[in-house]
């Protein structure tokens, strides 16, 4: 596992911050009346994370890498006392505006997650992260230690992510790069990935042909690295799941649409894990 000093870490994460700031307007341009959707009782969460989370009513929950806060506010509606943390300015500004407009109670912090977890005095019953989160972080061990620090004794980490195996394949489904990769992957920037299935409030054409002017850096963690970092941080793994479908995201061409805004592998392809879930207790 590659190691980065604090200066390198900040440089990598700050570049990702700029890239996410550049992409946020394009992402939200495709989502119709998000505040109205939430005020009417709408929920942006998928059944799988709700099943892993269980009943959150009355719990203190930190949403790690919360992006624009739609899922955070969906959890607040379910009774959780929600704190959201994200490195990028534009998503946090949007989340705060959405919370004010919906009158759903949640607190949002703009910070590098590593810095925030190392210094926050707050403690939580649940630390939650989902869909495209840990692949933006340059040190998985530091992430897991930070999660352990902000959890109360008996608190839970709940993680639902795209399976690391999928990043070895191109959109065509052809094997494109090794599963085992070390170091930072220099990429073209956060893309505009928001389609119909990521806009439950209603999809709009919005920004067309978005090209991000800011590059980004990704990190390809294996399942073993994720589990080992969790264990090494002192968290006790309780649940591990693999799913043969992807929520809200057409990862490959010709994927099969399924109920619940899911996609399965193309009919001509063998089944493979497309997401995984993890619950670990402090």
Which sequence ranges carry the predicted segments?
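N-terminal, positively charged/glycine-rich alpha-helical extensions of SAM-dependent methyltransferases
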Residues: 1-35
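Conserved alpha-helix/loop element of class I SAM-dependent methyltransferases that forms part
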Residues: 32-60
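Class I SAM-dependent methyltransferase SAM/SAH-binding core
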Residues: 59-116
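A short acidic, Gly/Pro-enriched loop at the edge of an enzyme's catalytic core
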Residues: 114-127
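A short SAM/SAH-binding and catalytic strip from SAM-dependent methyltransferases
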Residues: 125-141
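A short glycine-rich, Lys/Arg-flanked "PGG" loop and its adjoining helix->strand segment in the class I
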Residues: 141-156
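Conserved class I S-adenosyl-L-methionine
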Residues: 156-203
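Short alpha-helix
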Residues: 217-240
């Amino acid at each position: 596992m590659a190691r980065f000093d604090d200066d390198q870490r900040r440089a990598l994460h700050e570049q990702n911050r700029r890239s996410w700031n550049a992409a946020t307007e394009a992402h939200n341009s495709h989502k119709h009346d998000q505040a109205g959707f939430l005020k009417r009782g709408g929920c942006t969460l998928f059944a799988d994370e709700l099943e892993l989370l269980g009943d959150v009513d009355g719990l203190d929950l930190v949403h790690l890498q919360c992006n624009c806060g739609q899922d955070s506010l969906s959890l607040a509606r379910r009774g959780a006392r929600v704190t959201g943390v994200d490195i990028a300015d534009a998503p946090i500004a949007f989340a705060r505006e959405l919370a004010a407009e919906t009158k759903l109670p949640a607190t949002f912090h703009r910070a590098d997650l590593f810095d925030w977890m190392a210094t926050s005095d707050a403690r939580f019953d649940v630390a939650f992260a989902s869909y495209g989160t840990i692949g933006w972080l340059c040190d998985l061990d530091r992430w897991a230690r930070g999660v352990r620090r902000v959890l109360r004794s008996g608190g839970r980490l709940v993680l639902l992510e795209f399976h690391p195996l999928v990043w070895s394949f191109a959109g065509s489904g052809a094997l494109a790069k090794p599963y085992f990769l070390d170091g930072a992957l220099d990429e073209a920037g956060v893309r505009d990935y928001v389609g119909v299935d990521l806009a439950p409030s209603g999809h709009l054409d919005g920004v067309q042909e978005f090209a991000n002017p800011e590059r980004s850096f990704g990190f390809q963690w294996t399942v073993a690295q994720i589990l080992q970092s969790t264990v090494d941080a002192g968290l006790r793994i309780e649940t591990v799941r693999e799913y043969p479908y992807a929520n809200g995201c057409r990862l490959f061409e010709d994927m099969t649409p399924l109920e619940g805004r899911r996609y399965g592998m193309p009919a001509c392809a063998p089944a493979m894990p497309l997401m995984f879930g993890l619950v670990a207790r402090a």
